Amino acid sequence: MAESLRLATWDAGLSRRGPGLLLSDIDKGDPQVAAAVALIAGVRPDVLLLTGFDWDHDGMALAAFAAALKAAGLAYPHRYAPRPNAGMQSGLDLDGNGRTGEPRDAQGYGRFTGQSGMALLSRLPLRTEAARDFSAFLWAALPGSLIDGAGLAPEVRAVQRLSATGHWDVPVVLPSGRDLHLLAFAATPPLFDGPEDRNGRRNRDEAAFWLRYLDGALPEPPPPAPFAILGDADLDPARGEGRRDALAALLSDPRLQDPQPAGVRGTATAVYGAPLRLDYILPSADLRVTGAAVVWPDGPDEAARRALVWVDISLP
């Protein structure tokens, strides 16, 4: 193992319109899947958070994708992918259109359970037995949340989870035996709502969750250093729609550092009309960053809309 650790996060667009379709595409060697494998194998992260990756009950798609990576020379024997909120039906009419069981009635948008979930792959051991999955954390339970203005009916407010996909704290075991806590998430886009700005409020609070967690303001104690926040905040610090105060607080928090990885489009990690920085890796301030970059893929459009972000840290 090298003396540095490479962390990466990427929304590779490995999501399909129905259950089982991603597994089928992986097995067939779909061009988008092949492009994703090639990019990851070229970057060679030690730990990779994949967002926008379809979850299934038996983890078959993730196992098949890991096998494809292994065939390309990059083995990830350690993986973590609990059921996400994406596509998890609430049983209620969450969007208030008079119908239930639709994609917007799930705890996180999804046509089926697990659509566009997330997965953690690691060359180093993960202490999954000590992992904290905050996916069931209620939006209304977050101190200082913006739920009050979201226009939710009382019965919806009582069950609405904060995470559109998930919030995880997963310890990775470093060669020294120390734990590095990986704080992973993939937020809802601050779009596709009405004047109540429900998704904008929720997106803001998904970032604010980490501030409250580090503050010790949640029922669970904060993680000890070293740690790193990584994932898809789905919000640019300056451009596009969204409520930026919580993200700005994370980027300027003295407990964290922002290496500002850059590539051919600067710090942008996505292109939706304009280049936007949506994906982040924020190591704790005690870690020494030795490198960082944004890597854009070649290949089919869906694979090329989002870039992989990596950060190298010295092993503590």
Q: Where are each of the predicted segments found?
A:
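Solvent-exposed, acidic/flexible segments
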Residues: 25-33, 54-62, 110, 114, ...
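Active-site beta-strand/loop signature of hydrolases that rely on acidic residues for catalysis
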Residues: 7-12, 36-62, 82-84, 117, ...
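Short, solvent-exposed loop/turn and secondary-structure capping segments
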Residues: 18-21, 59-62, 90-94, 131-134, ...
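Active-site His/acidic residue clusters
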Residues: 178-201
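Solvent-exposed loop/turn segments at secondary-structure junctions
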Residues: 12-16, 53-57, 84-89, 126-127, ...
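N-terminal, active-site-proximal structural segment of metallo-dependent hydrolase catalytic domains
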Residues: 1-118, 156-158, 176-180, 315-316
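Metal-dependent phosphoester-hydrolase catalytic domains
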Residues: 125-135, 162, 171-174, 200-208, ...
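A well-ordered secondary-structure block
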Residues: 93-175
